[in-house]
Amino acid sequence: MFDIGWSELMVIGVVALIAIGPKELPGVLRMVGQWMGKARKLAGEFQGQFQEAMREAEMADLKKSFDEVKSAATGFTENNVLTSLQKDVDAAMTIDKVQNIDTPPAVPTTPEPPTAETFAEAEAHAMQTTVTEPLAILPPAVAEPAAAEPAVPEPAATTAPVAVDAAADKDAKAS
């Protein structure tokens, strides 16, 4: 606090001893100590109040910045593109629900996957129809007699005998 050295402190002590006297010097020093304690206590209280005011100011600034961030976050969620799109989709869905009540259910546009029964029905239908024209392009001389006689459909050849014949040919070539 005060820039007082040892030599200056000794001079103050000697002057106090001469001015006050040795008899009253301990009481005076005690009173000066009490004043110093009171001064330190007041300085501590002032410093504490000052620091508390600084903390409150910092807290006010912190609260203000927190409120700014909170309002920005609220504004961000209100102006969020996804939120607005979600609101539009929800509105469209409610309109679709109102329209779906009045209209009958739509027929699916994708065909059902074929089953073994549909293949059997198609083969039976093909067997019942007669072929009036030859399936292969033949020269005109051969095509005329075939047209004169009604064609009898031959049963469809299966792939299993062809596979057996191919296996038999391999066995014959190997021997």
From Swiss-Prot:
**What's in the keyword line of the UniProt record?**
Cell inner membrane, Cell membrane, Membrane, Protein transport, Translocation, Transmembrane, Transmembrane helix, Transport
Sequence segments annotated as region (Disordered): 145-175
Q: How does it sit in the membrane?
A: Single-pass membrane protein
Q: Which GO terms describe its cellular component?
A: TAT protein transport complex
Task: Tell me the domain of life.
Answer: Bacteria
| UniProt keyword Transmembrane helix present | yes
Q: Which family does it belong to?
A: Belongs to the TatB family.
Protein name per UniProt: Sec-independent protein translocase protein TatB
Q: Which residues cross the membrane?
A: 1-21
Gene Ontology BP, a term: protein transport by the Tat complex
- Give the compositionally biased regions (Low complexity): 145-166
Where is this protein found? Cell inner membrane
GO molecular function terms noted in the UniProt entry = protein transmembrane transporter activity
UniProt cross-references to InterPro entries, sorted A to Z: TatB (IPR018448)
Q: List the disulfide bonds.
A: none
Q: How does it assemble?
A: The Tat system comprises two distinct complexes: a TatABC complex, containing multiple copies of TatA, TatB and TatC subunits, and a separate TatA complex, containing only TatA subunits. Substrates initially bind to the TatABC complex, which probably triggers association of the separate TatA complex to form the active translocon.
Q: What does this protein do?
A: Part of the twin-arginine translocation (Tat) system that transports large folded proteins containing a characteristic twin-arginine motif in their signal peptide across membranes. Together with TatC, TatB is part of a receptor directly interacting with Tat signal peptides. TatB may form an oligomeric binding site that transiently accommodates folded Tat precursor proteins before their translocation.
Key word Ribosomal protein present in the record?
no
